[in-house]
Amino acid sequence: MASLTFEHVKKSYHSQLTVKDFDLDVKDKELLVLVGPSGCGKSTTLRMVAGLESISEGNLLIDGERVNDLPPKERDIAMVFQNYALYPHMTVFDNMAFGLKLRKMAKQEIAERVHAAARILEIEHLLKRKPKALSGGQRQRVALGRSIVREPKVFLMDEPLSNLDAKLRVTMRTEISKLHQRLEATIIYVTHDQTEAMTMGDRIVVMNEGEIQQVAKPHDIYHYPANLFVAGFIGSPGMNFLKGIIEQQHGELFFTNSSIRLHIPEEKAKRLKEKGYAGEQMIAGVRPEHITQMTGNDQLFDSVFQANVEVNENLGSELIVHVMAGDERLKVRLDGNTRIDAGDSIQLSVKMDHVVFFDAETEEAVY
């Protein structure tokens, strides 16, 4: 396998920058996920690696070798698309072997590679079938197998699960993760689905409007987002955002607005003071699971507020409750056994250690 290096890579169309200063090292044997909304530049970035798009500025290195001007066939990469692009008149075996036959590889080696890949993907029993006799998941496995037999330096996957139904996507996410472990492959995986990114990636690159917003492990992306965009894009349901002011009283800090007053813990307060945010406007980000329902037996804290239940989403293991607290509309994740009805008035508390504060102007997170 191989490492990749993007050195300030840019892509422009008619003077319009679609990928802006993409600077990143992809480690050998890493599964790196590029995630972001449609049009953020993630697929364009992948196509530049494949050689299907030219690089406007910067350098792309595979194992230390500059490949900007190398044609796709000389880059030793394999690509899997959301459309399987299988030849309908060929068997599964012939579809998987097609690229090797074009290279004039020996028949014995072709057979060995195809059967080895089929064993890994558990499709040996399908080798004599044609694509029309396969399910969507089986076709996707064949498309993966066609890439595996080439034994490339790098696998590129461009939204390969988009055409599958929800249940099959979950299964195939696991299959691709297992495949990565077995092959010890370097994989760059593109998706707009943040759940795929969180569950599959060794690291995640969050992109928006052609720019890298954050590169980190899934845990850090979720708990320590770099900015407001990352915080809002990653997580389902999304993070709650509250606009307010950092108020100082008797040496302590509170986040306040017309609807809510939250006491800021000592360590967070100290850092906010040091960075000059006392008395300033900020945005507080609260994950739905970091808002809890208070009961009559709970001790009252400063970060407690009253809310009215608007809608419940019962997902079985959990309950997503949409509430109004004054002028603030919030999403709350509670245990599935919680008994709450629309119209109820409930008391909620915020786990302040988990709140992320953002600069109101730059929208950058403040830690």
Swiss-Prot record:
State the UniProt keywords alphabetically.
ATP-binding, Nucleotide-binding, Translocase, Transport
Q: Which GO terms describe its biological process?
A: carbohydrate transport
A GO molecular-function annotation: ABC-type transporter activity
Stored PROSITE patterns:
ABC_TRANSPORTER_1, ABC_TRANSPORTER_2
- SMART domains tied to this protein: AAA (SM00382)
Residue span(s) of domain ABC transporter: 4-234
> Into which EC class is this enzyme placed?
translocase
Q: Which family does it belong to?
A: Belongs to the ABC transporter superfamily.
**Under which EC number(s) is this enzyme classified?**
7.-.-.-
Q: Which GO terms describe its cellular component?
A: ATP-binding cassette (ABC) transporter complex, substrate-binding subunit-containing
Q: What is this protein called?
A: Uncharacterized ABC transporter ATP-binding protein YurJ
